[in-house]
From Swiss-Prot:
Record-given protein name: Small ribosomal subunit protein bS20
Organism: Variovorax paradoxus (strain S110)
GO molecular function: small ribosomal subunit rRNA binding; structural constituent of ribosome
Biased composition (Basic residues): 1-20
Protein family per UniProt: Belongs to the bacterial ribosomal protein bS20 family.
Extent of Polar residues compositional bias: 25-34
A Gene Ontology term for the protein's cellular component: small ribosomal subunit
Lineage: Bacteria, Pseudomonadati, Pseudomonadota, Betaproteobacteria, Burkholderiales
Gene (UniProt): rpsT
Keyword annotations: Ribonucleoprotein, Ribosomal protein, RNA-binding, rRNA-binding
NCBIfam families listed in its UniProt record: S20
Amino acid sequence: MASAKPKKKNPRLASGRKRVRQDTKLNAANTSLRSKYRTAVKNVEKAVLAGDKTKASELFAKAQSIVDTVADKGIFHKNKAARDKSRLSAKVKALALAPEKAAA
């Protein structure tokens, strides 16, 4: 696990103190969203590995929304979000087409 950062000195100016409060809240929000993003992607990949088509497509739809939200808020770059969505989509699509190719 990551070790705790050393405590910084408290700012003297009121604007500095306010900035510290804001940064703490934003850091918590960004950490939470980043965690949701990673969890959503992992859940889709698990469903694909398990071979569950319906669950994978449902989870992919939810993951798309989360990925877009994270990109809009600037937590991850929009190109990274697009790349991850594209890769997940390809995995879900390959899962959906797999039995048809095996039967043909």
